[in-house]
Amino acid sequence: MKFLLDHDVPEDLSYLLEQLGHDVILLRKALAEDASDEEVLQFAHERGCVLLTCNRDDFLHLATKQLHHGIVIVIRRRTRAAERAALFRLLEGAGETGLQNNINFA
């Protein structure tokens, strides 16, 4: 599966995804920092990526208006280890079909 990590997602989550065999694009290496949320979601959609973001409010709203391949809202936790564990549990439980074209929380 392919993932696009938004600017606000801790980069160490990319290492977990890569270790699990997923392709990862870091938004900060692909688009300007001032890219709009609409541009980010379109970029992910055009590349067949599930978007990982901490920006819940804006992307929940956009998901009702724009096509997407899936959005994972990363909930900030006390530690990075807890964030990695939550994402791992989501990936294990949802699988590819549960993530694609859906909105999930990790």
Set out the residue ranges of the language-model regions.
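Short active-site oxyanion
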Residues: 1-3, 45-50
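Acidic, PIN/NYN-like endoribonuclease modules and their adjacent C-terminal/linker elements
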Residues: 2, 6-7, 11, 15-20, ...
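A short beta-strand-loop structural module common to alpha/beta enzyme folds
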Residues: 23-31
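Short, conserved beta-strand segments within well-ordered enzyme catalytic domains
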Residues: 25, 50-53, 73
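Acidic, metal-binding active-site segment of PIN/NYN-like and related structure-specific nucleases
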Residues: 37, 48-61
